[in-house]
């Protein structure tokens, strides 16, 4: 037990730092808008893990001299056309952005210290959304059931403050956090909406993204097991959650989880190979076990959230599905495990017989109906999928119109490049190409056929990805190798987040 308790002990060196005085430094807001800053330079030296307020003040002062996003007193007359309400919202938003940066500082240093202590190399591939799907392909073929979980959110804003209170001992900063939460009451935007793309409100996005990830990782860390066959609630490896939007871990052994704060022993169910994956507000827990075991996991999670985090989760927010019978709606794909049968004729001497081979295959299918609905909402087509002109773009230049359509088409091609069936993707690309042609024809008061005849093949090349352009130069389009490459699945490890299609302008 002492060994477990040693793992749970926190590094108190940074908890005594007070962040509240930085709120009154106007330079901190230049820091808030400089997202490219490498926070590792906040360490005083290479061998010291302590965070320095002096270094932070020097950095934000230097950035302020090159940043013009800060409103000064001289700008008050220029901003009089803003109403009082708009000014209040603008200033409060800037303060919340600065507060988010200040709170992120110690957790960023904790992440760096954790990675260095474990000698873990930070790989950009781990941050990619697509890195989850190769994990599915490798593991799900051997699993039976999956829990489809909508992560609950606190019913009261004070729960967020209490969660952060364990780590931040600055009472003034916590009071300021309460002010932001009760001022805007944006926590409802963290619930699971109908459109999976939207989870956080655009206002105060950085602050609420941090609070949401921090709150989730508090109870999510119980699923993270150390390699030395022990586990504790506040694992040192939880810091990876602060950097990535998604997280997956593997449970390997049944252990006693000692929780210093709760003062109780939590027992996990004996299960050798469950796998956990989360992206934004949705998570899945896949297992090789039986249906009874998955029902135990379901009610364990419900009672765990209610008893220890005061979070109400209804049973209907957790679905138990058998992988061989149901598709998993996750991250814009319908994923399933299906049986792929093939018959082989074998000849042995004078006897011939047929061998029926059954192979498990992981399928990722594009949800064509919801995607056409998104295109219809963005005015690229009607609800039936027939392309229409984008009238609001007719005032733009021809090159801008083609560039916008081409960028959306390329983004969709990259994201859905891992689909098992490319027919739906080709239909989406056809809708965008014809919508672009109709928009240009409407602008020039011409017909689509005449406009396409004038532009020729150069118009279609704008919608090709870089990979498709290279393949068209190397291989003939009708060759067998080319067709196999076009039908193949590709996962791009440079995709970090999903952008809203309608606002990708």
UniProtKB/Swiss-Prot annotation:
| InterPro entries found in the cross-reference section | Domain_X (IPR024937), Maturase_MatK (IPR002866), Maturase_MatK_N (IPR024942)
* Keywords in alphabetical order: Chloroplast, mRNA processing, Plastid, RNA-binding, tRNA processing
Q: Which GO terms describe its biological process?
A: mRNA processing; RNA splicing; tRNA processing
Pfam families, per database record: Intron_maturas2, MatK_N
Signal peptide positions are: none
The protein's location, in the record's own words, is:
Plastid, Chloroplast
Which Gene Ontology MF annotations are present? RNA binding
The keyword Acetylation is assigned to this record: no
Q: Name one GO cellular component term.
A: chloroplast
Is Transmembrane helix set as a keyword in this record? Answer: no
Purpose of the protein? Usually encoded in the trnK tRNA gene intron. Probably assists in splicing its own and other chloroplast group II introns.
Q: Family, per the entry? A: Belongs to the intron maturase 2 family. MatK subfamily.
Please give the PANTHER family that the UniProt record associates with this protein: MATURASE K
Protein name, as recorded? Maturase K
Per the UniProt entry, what species is this protein from, by scientific name?
Phaulothamnus spinescens
